[in-house]
Regions:
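Partner-binding and oligomerization surfaces adjacent to conserved cores of proteins
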Residues: 1-165
């Protein structure tokens, strides 16, 4: 079942140009090395997304405990474990792309005083490179209802696995 959830998350394969916003220094590094690096997400702009994920899990588990779940201690242990794994455990690496090459929000983040670039990449090439490195390409989920639904599915599945032991 976790494979089905994962497959669904990564099933929306990009077909249009993907854009990577960076600084001129980043551009020079990419051109000189002919390599696009994935960075540790804890040190990127996106690090808040990890904390947000942990917060959503905490809310879901707290709601279950408040509703009178039969094993609150076990749920709290799961919460501690998953929070640690998300914030301190696995090293997660990411390279960020957008489907729009001209977004004001991205220019503000990457072009201090107008000194940034938006590099367009063929999505087939990005997918090929990701597959060679055992990376997965997927869209960020920004819709809060979709985020909560996904968290609920994962907690349900993990609870099912834990409670069978």
């Amino acid at each position: 079942m976790i494979k089905a959830i994962t497959k669904n998350l990564y099933s929306d394969i990009p077909k249009e140009t993907l854009y990577h916003y960076t600084t001129f220094t980043g551009l020079v590094g990419i051109v000189d090395s002919q390599v696009l690096w994935a960075s540790d997400i804890r040190y990127m702009n996106d690090s808040a997304e990890l904390k947000h994920t942990a917060d959503l899990i905490r809310i879901e588990i707290t709601q279950r405990i408040t509703a009178g779940h039969s094993k609150p201690k076990l749920l709290n242990q799961f919460l501690e474990w998953v929070t640690h794994r998300i914030t301190n455990g696995h090293m997660l690496f990411a390279a960020s792309f957008r489907s729009n090459g001209n977004l004001l929000s991205q220019w503000r983040g990457y072009s201090k005083l107008g000194k940034g670039v938006s590099l367009g990449f063929n999505p087939s090439y990005i997918l090929k490179c990701a597959n060679e490195q055992s990376f997965q390409v997927g869209k960020c989920i920004y819709n809060s209802a979709d985020q909560r639904r996904l968290i609920k599915q994962v907690v349900d599945l993990k609870w099912l696995l834990i409670s069978t032991f």
